From Swiss-Prot:
<keyword id="KW-0539">Nucleus</keyword>
<comment type="function">
    <text>Transcriptional regulator that may regulate the expression of the loline biosynthesis cluster 1, one of the 2 clusters involved in the biosynthesis of loline alkaloids, potent insecticidal agents composed of a pyrrolizidine ring system and an uncommon ether bridge linking carbons 2 and 7.</text>
</comment>
<dbReference type="GO" id="GO:0005634">
    <property type="term" value="C:nucleus"/>
</dbReference>
<protein>
    <recommendedName>
        <fullName>Loline biosynthesis cluster 2 transcription factor lolU2</fullName>
    </recommendedName>
</protein>
<keyword id="KW-0017">Alkaloid metabolism</keyword>
<dbReference type="InterPro" id="IPR023213">
    <property type="entry name" value="CAT-like_dom_sf"/>
</dbReference>
<keyword id="KW-0805">Transcription regulation</keyword>
<keyword id="KW-0804">Transcription</keyword>
<dbReference type="GO" id="GO:0009820">
    <property type="term" value="P:alkaloid metabolic process"/>
</dbReference>
């Protein structure tokens, strides 16, 4: 077996046992997400906040059987990114003080591949097809890889505790570089001979250590307290938030399967959208988010009598706050996001402009003190985390409508994080390519999640939902309304919109 500590740089905060197992307590952001998972209404055998990631690959035609190469690349990935094999709660233990731990066992190559890499075909098939892989997320101790030969698709499944979306795409680049290297060097090279973008495998510290959070008992300054109070006011004002009607009789139903649909914007349409947004002085993300809000507000007969506001959960990327030495591929497999609440009040006129103003701000400095000066997340996260957890744990509040506002995660152009092709030299054909990507978030409540990104010149807007609460037909019409709202508000012809919606596309 290969201990992570034998070949990787191990940061402060990790403890090594006699057999080479490494552990550290969950950091503040991991504990924040774990609390959200534990609050979820999840049936036994399923997990909230699970990620199912689909990579449709084009591999060398002269390789008759790509499976050994994919297995080897998955092993290389584990070697250079030890955290892909990390064990998180509920499978990891607690320390003597009761804190949850992240555990990285020594790497046994054969055991790692036996447990975590599966070929989905014949009697060994776990899923019916690629679409089926995203419907039910059953928890596993480590990340899992499933190869679907008919569609040449690699499906990676993991708890969200292991990485966020940006980290996942960064990690994809590492995996693809390793795969190209395996095709180039063959199956028998030593693990440290294969090349990726990871210069030295490492186990980075928890984000608490990097950001220098003070001990829990440290007194909180008045300016930090005011900034946290401002964020919490957004949560409280957003209690009376707009929502979509769920299917009749499903208010108290247990969650069922995660489903998804996607609407595509081809390159000419995307160029027109970008031009329209530039003319308005807003980002594409703000325009899409405004369209979602408009559609939600178009169901007035379904709203609670007090629902006048719209709570917008914004995803803040903490990576810009990290020391530059940690903003590297080695830190891809880490949770570096935080949800910031922003409540839209006072009606929906000039919605795009107001949302655009929020999106144009640095979300890491969105909260402000009593003088209006921004307060960094570095200062307020510890206090805000505890207050947000207490608030969300108090829901539902009597007399308030159900709390199920839509989330939008906007990832921009994925080519910032990964390439379309790998191993291409000059006019030669690339060794391997990513033809398409898709990411499905497991949903276990009536909250609808959107994800927006562009890859290979096509913008995709995904919608994820749990089919215990909504029908496909209803949400297909909602997605069409969002699309039409976006195009019409930007002065674009929406006549082709129905062709862009594909509920079944992976």
């Amino acid at each position: 077996m290969v201990s992570a500590g034998n070949h990787a740089i191990v940061a402060l905060g990790w403890t090594t046992s006699e057999d080479g197992t490494l552990t550290r307590p969950l950091d503040l952001v991991e504990n924040w997400l774990l609390a959200r998972i534990q609050r979820a209404n999840t049936p036994p055998g399923r997990e909230a906040e699970g990620l199912t990631y689909k990579l449709k690959l084009r591999l060398p035609q002269d390789i008759d059987d790509p499976i050994p190469y994919l297995r080897r690349a998955w092993l290389v990935f584990r070697y250079v990114q030890p955290l892909i094999g990390a064990i998180y709660p509920p499978y990891s233990e607690r320390d003597e003080t009761g804190r949850y731990l992240v555990t990285v066992p020594p790497m046994d190559p054969e055991e790692w591949l036996r447990l975590s890499f599966h070929v989905n075909q014949g009697s060994q098939a776990v899923f019916r097809d690629v679409d089926d892989a995203g419907m039910i997320f059953r928890p596993r101790p480590t990340a899992m890889a499933y190869w679907f030969p008919p569609s040449s698709t690699l499906v990676i499944r993991s708890t969200h505790l292991r990485f966020d979306a940006v980290g996942l795409y960064k990690a994809t680049n590492t995996f693809m570089l390793g795969l190209e290297s395996v095709f180039r060097l063959g199956l028998d090279a030593n693990l440290d001979c294969y090349t990726t973008d990871v210069k030295q495998p490492s186990l980075p510290p928890g984000i608490d250590y990097i950001l220098g959070f003070p001990p829990q008992e440290t007194p909180v300054s008045h300016r930090v307290g005011c900034a946290v109070d401002e964020l919490m006011r957004h949560w409280h004002h957003g209690l009376y938030s707009l929502s979509l009607p769920v299917r009749e009789g499903s208010e108290d139903a247990a969650p069922a399967n995660t489903q998804h649909m996607v609407t595509l914007f081809d390159e000419p349409t995307l160029e027109a959208i970008v031009a329209g947004c530039k003319e308005l002085g807003v980002s594409v993300s703000a325009a899409v988010h405004a369209s979602i809000v408009r559609v939600w507000a178009s169901f007035p007969q379904q709203q609670h009598t007090g629902a006048r506001n719209m709570l917008i959960p914004l995803v803040a990327n903490l990576r810009p706050l990290l020391d530059p030495k940690w903003v590297v591929p080695d830190y891809a497999l880490s949770l570096c996001i935080f949800v910031v609440p922003f409540c839209l009040t006072g009606g929906f006129e000039d919605l795009t402009q107001r949302l655009g103003a929020v999106y144009s701000r640095d979300l890491s400095a969105l909260p402000s003190d009593s003088a209006g000066d921004p307060v960094s997340f570095l200062e307020l996260l510890p206090l805000y985390d505890s207050q947000e957890a207490a608030f969300l744990g108090s829901l539902p509040v009597a007399g308030c409508p159900p709390f199920r506002v839509p989330n939008l995660s906007s990832l921009g152009v994925l080519e910032r994080y990964l390439a379309r092709a790998y191993g291409q030299k000059g006019a030669q054909a690339p060794v391997c390519e990513i033809e398409d990507v898709a990411l499905v978030n497991a949903t276990t409540d009536p909250t609808i999640e959107f994800q927006l990104f562009t890859f290979r010149g096509t913008m995709r807007l995904y919608l994820y939902y749990n089919d215990a609460y909504y029908t496909e037909d209803f949400l297909a019409s909602v997605m069409e309304m969002v699309r039409e709202s976006l195009l019409q508000e930007l002065g674009l012809d929406g006549s082709e919109s129905s062709e862009g919606l594909d509920p079944k596309e992976a």
